[in-house]
Amino acid sequence: MAVVFEASTSPIVGREGDIVGARQLKERLMREKESNISMRIDETEDKSGVRVAGRGVLHLSVLIETMRREGFEFQVGRPQVVYKTDEHGNKLEPIEEATLDVPNDYSGKAIEVMGTAGGIMEDMASDETMTHLVFRIPSRGTMGLKTRILNVTHGEGVLFHHFREYGPYTGEMQGRKNGGMIAMSTDKAVAYALDTLQQRGRLFVKPGDECYEGMIVGESAKEGDMVVNVSKTKNLGNQRSSTADKAIQLTPPVTFTLEEALEYIEDDELVEVTPQSIRMRKRLLSATDRRKANKN
């Protein structure tokens, strides 16, 4: 797996980190290159960032976590697998072996999830309570897979996967089904706005959180991104509805670890990393810019 490190372009850059410059980021990663032989670290062709290749998302997350603790503030793109070509010019991708142990009642749902991730079942065995499954699966399909397995098995599934070989490229893979809730402006989230939005999907922020235009503040229940106003306040007037004075009750927001955030984002999204926060955002912050890019 490989990710590209870039200097942060967030509207609130510098508020939480002490080291934010592109030059300082590159110097730190080049020092890592000299001491860490398990990673391949090189500048991107356009010199806009540094590409770091490691053994997997967890391996890359360790470096990112170390740097944020050192005071760095930066952004990283979606992890990409490292492809190869054979002697005939055919595209090859890394293939892994995944073993899965799930309660019998959830085996069908687990097999379905593995199938949507590109997995091909090679072995299956079960006893009175548990089912043991073995799959051949592209490395691309393992991103976010653990979370999905835990969801469909109610936390009882155990997944382990490791690299097996390079094999023929298996084609395009379906991305995230649900769209994101994208903030329309830079402001703090307020409870009134979030109360309305939580009826349309899952929230990633709570009242008082700093948000900015292009930041992913939740997941829509439907396909396609939706631009939302997280700072909308109640219109004050003389007339009160019967529910006006009811206390707002918000469902706790979904929180992401660094590894989960990297696995969640799509190709047009980034993870913003600071010593205090992990945020997800669109690469193009402006809704107008995103519409233009989609047309092209």
What spans do the regions from the language model cover?
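Accessory interaction regions appended to the cores of large information-processing enzymes
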Residues: 1-296
